[in-house]
Amino acid sequence: MRLTLQHINRLKVLLHLAGFLPLLWLILSVDQGWFSADPAKDIQHFTGRMALKLLLATLLVTPLARYGKQPLLIRCRRLLGLWCFFWATLHLVSYALLELGLDHLALLGKELISRPYLTLGIISWLILLALAVTSPQIMMRKLGSQWQKLHNFVYLVAILTPIHYLWSVKTLSPQPILYALAALILLLLRYKKFRQWWR
């Protein structure tokens, strides 16, 4: 069945809910004390995983549209990318406020430089910021051919963020490995595009 614009509009509503409802759950979890004895870490990990899930979902759109012969699915990619940036920003803010605290925010720059996994994280966030700012149609028209070159940096984010996650956990568990494998598979699906860049 070929998806229509009506289907896509309904899908967008569901995707907005998928991006927003976890925020309500996060707020409720904090209010009800559902987290562990270290809620600051739990919040950081939850927001980080949400950003990574949405990044992977964003990267999945193009293969689904291409191999499923559903070109209108591409219209969902920007929405997912913006939700990814939203959760990545919450992840950064949660680290700055809950790990360092308001009294030690001045140390943020030093922390980002001295800890390699944080360096990868902030590089990824800065790229996502650039992609979010330039995502509207008006920016696409202004940047012309440079727009696609800029937005290809999402693949760098797909490499850096799983490494950031793997590096940040003290005890290696299956979860970050699975995210890294998922990112690798999605990147391999675009190998033809990468080959064109390297020629």
Swiss-Prot record:
Coiled coil: none annotated. It is found in: Cell inner membrane. It comes from the Bacteria. Keywords: Cell inner membrane, Cell membrane, Electron transport, Flavoprotein, FMN, Heme, Iron, Membrane, Metal-binding, Transmembrane, Transmembrane helix, Transport. One of its GO terms (biological process) is protein repair. Pfam families: Ferric_reduct (PF01794). It is a multi-pass membrane protein. GO terms for cellular component: plasma membrane. GO terms for molecular function: electron transfer activity; FMN binding; heme binding; metal ion binding; oxidoreductase activity, acting on diphenols and related substances as donors. InterPro entries: Fe3_Rdtase_TM_dom (IPR013130), MsrQ-like (IPR022837). Binds 1 FMN per subunit. Binds 1 heme b (iron(II)-protoporphyrin IX) group per subunit. The chain crosses the membrane at residues 13-33, 79-99, 120-140, 147-167, 169-189. Its cofactor is FMN; heme b. Heterodimer of a catalytic subunit (MsrP) and a heme-binding subunit (MsrQ). Belongs to the MsrQ family. Part of the MsrPQ system that repairs oxidized periplasmic proteins containing methionine sulfoxide residues (Met-O), using respiratory chain electrons. Thus protects these proteins from oxidative-stress damage caused by reactive species of oxygen and chlorine generated by the host defense mechanisms. MsrPQ is essential for the maintenance of envelope integrity under bleach stress, rescuing a wide series of structurally unrelated periplasmic proteins from methionine oxidation. This is Protein-methionine-sulfoxide reductase heme-binding subunit MsrQ. It comes from Pectobacterium atrosepticum (strain SCRI 1043 / ATCC BAA-672).
